[in-house]
Regions:
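Catalytic-core regions of core metabolic enzymes
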Residues: 1-139
Length: 139
């Protein structure tokens, strides 16, 4: 596998990608997330310390483009039974879980799996306070 060091090189290497996982210092994360949205990529933002204003701007812009921004501070998700970042591999099934706390969702899904049920998708959208403030701002 060839390594890339620049954003444009990565996008050229994977032209069919539909998701960007961003893990940089929070002060730089919004700029990179906006670049991903410019390229019509969904965003999973592992970075924390992103301002609420940046989070609202990113999520509003993503919604307008029909895209998804998970995070900031999103360290785990699973989409269509594919684990992303720090996610446990779970038996594939038909249950979907959406929430604000990645570790909370991870624990819930582990308990569901231990009970013999199967998970299809789990999405972590943001920290609880940010998610509530964002939801209130877009009403």
């Amino acid at each position: 596998m060839t390594q890339v060091r620049r954003w444009d090189s990565a996008c050229q290497k994977l032209p069919d990608a539909n998701l960007a996982l961003i893990s940089v210092a929070g002060e730089y994360a919004a700029e990179l997330a906006n670049q991903a949205l410019d390229r019509n990529l969904n965003v999973m933002m592992f970075s924390d310390n992103v301002t609420l204003e940046d989070e609202i701007q990113l999520k509003t812009r993503a919604r307008e483009k029909g895209l998804l921004v998970m995070g900031p501070d999103c360290g785990t998700s699973m989409i269509a039974a594919t684990p992303l970042a720090f996610a446990n591999v779970m038996p594939e099934g038909n249950i979907g879980v959406i929430g604000a706390s990645g570790t909370g969702i991870q624990e819930l899904c582990s308990q569901i799996a231990l009970a013999g049920k199967r998970i299809f998708t789990r999405l972590v959208l943001a920290g609880a306070i940010s998610a509530v403030k964002w939801a209130a701002s877009v009403r």
